[in-house]
């Protein structure tokens, strides 16, 4: 009589999520107990931990690493000398991911010739635009393309029907890569088409981040996909053990169809992204669809990731479609990726370059604001030289402490002339920049330490493309729905100021 409820009870408490959380919590508790037990009254242990923090500080000073990231960790180790060095080794150091690094670097090097910048593709760009494009081609290894149409979507529910139509038309390949995949209306619609296409012989592959999707997928998800002939990789699987590589998440959002059509942006495969589920008011997001030669960059981006973990092919030429007989003349489209496993901060540099070249305006969508002094100075200096710099952030947060951290940056920016808005209808999740009617970026890259330094990310740089104006118009249409923040709104109590200081200190961990 009680058997069914008991089975349901134990299946609920013994699922993968619960086991992972409980075991990690026990490990953290044990480490804290060991830390306090060893340090209490043991001068030599305290001295050893302080020496470790000092050595890590010296290591960071000499390391070829982004200055904002280094300063954040050095400050933390200075304030917490007993814990700082150990925290850096656990959560900040990229070196432990050697196996991950070697796999990805080997594939990237093997396929460098698949992405070579052709001079005619950047013809017509002015000096500053050419400089931005050249940087991405040389250091990001992703070239610029002409002959590509782009379409900007101002929300997930506008993008979703077009995505389904494109998936239905797939004839050869469908490559899907997302940080979050959750069961629900959005995923059900995509999955039904993927299953049908796989049954028709289309090469269907899926990469999803195991941490991002942990709460939203059944434990046998991979088995189900493979049975449906959908090849599947859960990236960096979450295990109930404290691991130094768990920081590195696949935050990218990519769909590539037949090598000709690609999608990216902030939209994941979960119901809140198309407002089929209300979590934090209206979910404001953005996405970009490209069709044409530039989709090849996303094809290589996906295949490099795929073959690093599940080697399938050494020659990508079969996935490259023929050039269109009807070329599109709509500026430059330049997809790019950023990896935490090298020393080149591609995503941050693209943002800094946009600020440096701006003459009239820079409009920014970002759900989070947790950046270093270099980015803060760039924002302030642009405003001080007369550029209309506007930041749009959420009015309803998804993470309250991170929201408080974001707000802690408001005052110095406002004092420099940056204008800041909070989107009052709900949560703004878009990650977009647009400047001077000339250039724009749409992608997965937040303005925080995790996106800029720890996650795998992607985006698209548009120059002299019609969708630059579409993004500009979207921002201008969104501003009346926002509350503009003024200096008088930033007053806080002494305890609040102390809390903000602590959050800023801990920002590399958030």
Region roles according to the model:
Residues 1-349, 353, 357, 397, ...:
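N-terminal localization/anchoring segments of enzymes in phospholipid and broader phosphate metabolism
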Residues 179, 368, 402:
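Glycine- and other small-residue-rich loops at beta-strand/loop junctions that grip anionic moieties
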Residues 350-354, 374-388, 405-408, 414:
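Exposed, interaction-prone extracellular/peripheral surfaces
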Residues 358, 368-390, 394, 399:
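Helical hairpin unit composed of two closely spaced alpha helices linked by a short loop
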Residues 361:
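Phosphate-/nucleic-acid-contacting segments
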Residues 420-424:
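Active-site donor-binding acidic/aromatic loop of nucleotide-activated sugar
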Residues 431:
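Catalytic-core elements of nucleic-acid end-processing and repair enzymes
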């Amino acid at each position: 009589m009680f058997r069914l409820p008991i089975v349901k009870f134990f299946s609920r408490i013994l699922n993968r999520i619960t086991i992972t959380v409980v075991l990690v919590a026990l490990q953290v508790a044990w480490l804290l107990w060991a830390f306090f037990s060893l340090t209490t009254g043991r001068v030599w242990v305290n001295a050893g931990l302080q020496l470790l923090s000092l050595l890590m500080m010296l290591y960071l000073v000499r390391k070829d690493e982004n200055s904002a990231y280094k300063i954040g960790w050095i400050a933390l180790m200075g304030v917490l000398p007993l814990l700082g060095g150990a925290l850096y080794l656990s959560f900040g150091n990229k070196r432990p991911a050697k196996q991950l690094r070697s796999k990805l670097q080997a594939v990237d090097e093997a396929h460098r010739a698949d992405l070579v910048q052709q001079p005619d593709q950047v013809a017509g760009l002015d000096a500053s635009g050419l400089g931005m494009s050249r940087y991405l081609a040389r250091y990001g290894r992703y070239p610029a393309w002409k002959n590509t149409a782009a379409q900007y979507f101002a929300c997930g529910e506008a993008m979703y029907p077009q995505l389904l139509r494109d998936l239905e038309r797939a004839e050869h390949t469908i490559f899907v890569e997302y940080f979050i995949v959750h069961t629900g209306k959005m995923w059900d619609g995509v999955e039904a088409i993927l299953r049908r296409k796989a049954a028709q012989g289309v090469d269907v592959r899926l990469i999803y981040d195991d941490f991002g999707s942990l709460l939203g997928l059944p434990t046998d998800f991979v088995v189900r996909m493979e049975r449906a002939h959908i090849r599947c990789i859960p990236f960096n699987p979450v295990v109930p053990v404290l691991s130094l590589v768990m920081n590195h998440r696949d935050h990218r959002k990519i769909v590539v169809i037949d090598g000709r059509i690609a999608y990216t942006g902030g939209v994941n495969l979960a119901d809140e992204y198309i407002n089929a589920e209300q979590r934090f008011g209206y979910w404001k997001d953005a996405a970009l669809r490209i069709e044409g030669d530039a989709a090849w960059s996303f094809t290589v981006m996906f295949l490099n990731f795929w073959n690093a973990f599940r080697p399938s092919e050494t020659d990508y030429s079969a996935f490259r479609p023929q050039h269109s007989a009807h070329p599109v003349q709509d500026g430059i489209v330049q997809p790019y990726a950023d990896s935490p496993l090298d020393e080149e901060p591609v995503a941050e540099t693209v943002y800094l370059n946009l600020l440096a070249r701006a003459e009239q305006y820079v409009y920014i969508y970002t759900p989070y604001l947790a950046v270093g002094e270099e980015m803060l100075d760039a924002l302030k200096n642009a405003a001080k030289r007369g550029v209309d710099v506007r930041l749009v952030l959420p009015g309803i947060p998804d993470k309250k402490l991170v929201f408080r951290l974001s707000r802690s940056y408001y005052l110095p920016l406002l004092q420099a002339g940056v204008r800041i808005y909070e989107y009052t209808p709900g949560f703004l999740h878009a990650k977009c920049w647009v400047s001077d009617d000339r250039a724009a970026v749409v992608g997965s890259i937040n303005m925080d330490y995790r996106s800029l330094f720890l996650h795998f990310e992607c985006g698209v740089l548009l120059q002299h493309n019609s969708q630059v104006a579409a993004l500009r118009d979207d921002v201008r249409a969104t501003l009346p729905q926002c509350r503009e923040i003024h200096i008088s709104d930033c007053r806080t109590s002494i305890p609040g100021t102390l809390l903000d200081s602590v959050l800023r200190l801990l920002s590399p961990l958030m």
